[in-house]
């Protein structure tokens, strides 16, 4: 198991739990790999306690060469855009008054080829804001307009992280559109909301996780480079969304165990999942501070001397916007005769809240992490 992948998973789980605390009954969605990449780039320019703090929060203790690790992951993940409607934008914008050191520029050039940009917040704020908004809009094929709200930057901004991630999935097996029906989605024990429910009968990898009374299923996207794992409680058992048990027991070891192929077996499954689109703009600053990332945001305590000789430089803001669309779309559903080994039919009906991850199977990195609680 790759040390960077373990580190990224641990950070993904920490961050997910933080966001769940903030949104106990709402939908949660973020892109851990985008956040990790941007913060790891900031770490290259940080020194002393600031660098150590980033390393601790991102669980880099056992990772030998962080920038090289991200270079490999980024180049692997970037190849996916030729198969999928997937865009992962991770930018670190630095004000030009910082006069970045040549050493910092050269050490980040290869591992973070497109991630670092020098801009002018100080003297040309409105123009710079417009440029960033337009560039993110272009890079996401027009999906994200005006990613920077009026108050997100000022002429005092020194370093800004902007993440924008969107994915419109195409399944390995297409859901027949004629089978999509409006059904009640149970947001808790007593209330329901209507949702368009997609249905298919096919062979999938599925398992039971008894410790959390849950089913898990792997749904591969076309070409199997990415998979969506759904963790679905057997029922809504608590007084909230039914996800309390999962959220409580979730840690990176548990997640690795739950998504391990040995937990699951091929089975013929009658599957029902909601058709949905979730768009979230999150402000991860408070969550990151709760996880121990405190110095980086304060001009009095942050140390970015590996990047610039300017004193009092801090990370001003982290903008993180994600959009995920799950539809019927996919390849032709052809059942392989050999896959009919298990004849008994399992059922997975996601008509109540569930946790999901979208994982890059080659590097096992989590691209998206979310919970779906309400249509």
UniProtKB/Swiss-Prot annotation:
It is found in: Secreted, Extracellular space. It comes from the Eukaryota. The keyword Aminoacyl-tRNA synthetase does not apply. GO terms for cellular component: extracellular space. The keyword Transcription regulation does not apply. Glycans are attached at residues 99, 133, 155, 188, 361. Gene3D superfamilies: Alpha-1-antitrypsin, domain 1, Antithrombin, subunit I, domain 2. Keywords: Glycoprotein, Secreted. The record marks 340-341 as: Reactive bond homolog. Belongs to the serpin family. Ov-serpin subfamily. PANTHER family: SERINE PROTEASE INHIBITOR, SERPIN, SERPIN B5. Tumor suppressor. It blocks the growth, invasion, and metastatic properties of mammary tumors. As it does not undergo the S (stressed) to R (relaxed) conformational transition characteristic of active serpins, it exhibits no serine protease inhibitory activity. This is Serpin B5. It comes from Plecturocebus moloch.
């Amino acid at each position: 198991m790759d040390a960077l992948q373990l580190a990224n998973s641990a950070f993904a789980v920490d961050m997910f739990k933080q966001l769940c605390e903030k949104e106990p009954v709402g939908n949660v969605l973020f892109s851990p790999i985008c956040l990790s990449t941007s913060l790891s780039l900031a770490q290259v320019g940080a020194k002393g306690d600031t660098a150590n703090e980033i390393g601790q929060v991102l669980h880099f203790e056992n990772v030998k060469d962080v920038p090289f690790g991200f270079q490999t992951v980024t180049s692997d993940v970037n190849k996916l855009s030729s198969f999928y409607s997937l865009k992962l934008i991770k930018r670190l914008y630095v004000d030009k008054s910082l006069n970045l050191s040549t050493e910092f520029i050269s050490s980040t050039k290869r591992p973070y080829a497109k991630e670092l940009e020098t801009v002018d917040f100080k003297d040309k704020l409105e123009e710079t804001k417009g440029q960033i908004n337009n560039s993110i809009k272009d890079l996401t094929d027009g999906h994200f307009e005006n990613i920077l709200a009026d108050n997100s930057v000022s002429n005092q901004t020194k370093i800004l992280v902007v993440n924008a991630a969107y994915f419109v999935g195409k399944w390995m097996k297409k859901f027949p559109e004629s089978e999509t029906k409006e059904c009640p989605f149970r947001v808790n024990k007593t209330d329901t909301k209507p949702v368009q429910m997609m249905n298919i009968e096919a062979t999938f990898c599925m398992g039971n996780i008894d410790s959390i009374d849950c089913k898990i299923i792997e749904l591969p996207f076309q070409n199997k480079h990415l998979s969506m794992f759904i963790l679905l409680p057997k029922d809504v058992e608590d007084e909230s969304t039914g996800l309390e048990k999962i959220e409580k027991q979730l840690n990176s070891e548990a997640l690795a165990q739950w998504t391990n192929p040995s937990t699951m077996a091929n089975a013929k499954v009658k599957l029902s999942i909601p058709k949905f689109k979730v768009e979230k703009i999150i402000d991860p600053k408070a969550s990151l501070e709760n996880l121990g990332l405190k110095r980086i945001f304060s001009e009095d305590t942050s140390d970015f001397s590996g990047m610039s000789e300017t004193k009092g430089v801090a990370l001003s803001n982290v903008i993180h916007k994600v959009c995920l669309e799950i539809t019927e779309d996919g390849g032709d559903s052809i059942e392989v005769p050999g896959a009919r080994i298990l004849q008994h039919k399992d059922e997975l009906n996601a008509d109540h809240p569930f946790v999901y991850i979208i994982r890059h199977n080659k590097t096992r990195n989590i691209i998206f992490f979310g919970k779906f609680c309400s249509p």
